[in-house]
Amino acid sequence: EEIGGIVPAEGITYEEISPQEAFLVRELRRRLSEHMGESSCFMYTKADQFEDWVKQRENNGDRIFVARDEEKIIAFMELSDSAENFVTEHPSMKNICGAYCLPEYRGKNIFQNLLNYVILILSREGSLYLGVDYESMNPTAYYFWRKYFKPYTCSVTRRIDGGEDRC
């Protein structure tokens, strides 16, 4: 069934899940964390840090949209009212603060359609802008997001606590 110009692949559906169902994307969050720890990102997260982080994410009330292949969740996109810089604090702006698609489903327009679905829902609700922050050392994110979004800020970071800077 076509949804606002989105023609899902056979068996693929898109929906928003409730905050109480946030645990349903836990495995995809783990896969995202593993991806960020691999080359070329090297943003490794220890198991206990991941558990603390995922509990916080599951309880923060952010909106989560998913793509399913039949009943299996194959991709998610998490949205927040705020993000990493002051520009995102506009009432008509929403921010993607987490996203992942299983590798075997990439290149099939599934994630693009999930993004289109999110945009459709947000525009119906009156949002005017959608932003996304991503790590520039993550080539998967860099090439995907820049196809669909225009850069509007530039941020840099420097570790100052004497620890190892892996960026």
What does each model-found stretch correspond to?
Residues 101, 107-124, 147:
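Conserved acetyl-CoA-binding loop-helix of GNAT-fold acetyltransferases
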Residues 13-30:
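A short beta-loop-alpha structural element at the N-terminal edge
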Residues 34-53:
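Conserved GNAT-fold acetyl-CoA-binding loop/helix
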Residues 122-134:
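Conserved GNAT acetyl-CoA-binding A-motif
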Residues 66, 72-81, 95, 100:
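Conserved beta-strand in the GNAT
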Residues 89-103, 157:
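Conserved acetyl-CoA binding element of GNAT-fold acetyltransferases
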Residues 52-66, 95, 150-153:
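A short helix-loop-beta-strand connector motif used in the catalytic cores of GNAT acetyltransferases and
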Residues 1-11, 142, 146-149, 153-163:
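Acyl-donor-binding surface of acyltransferase catalytic domains
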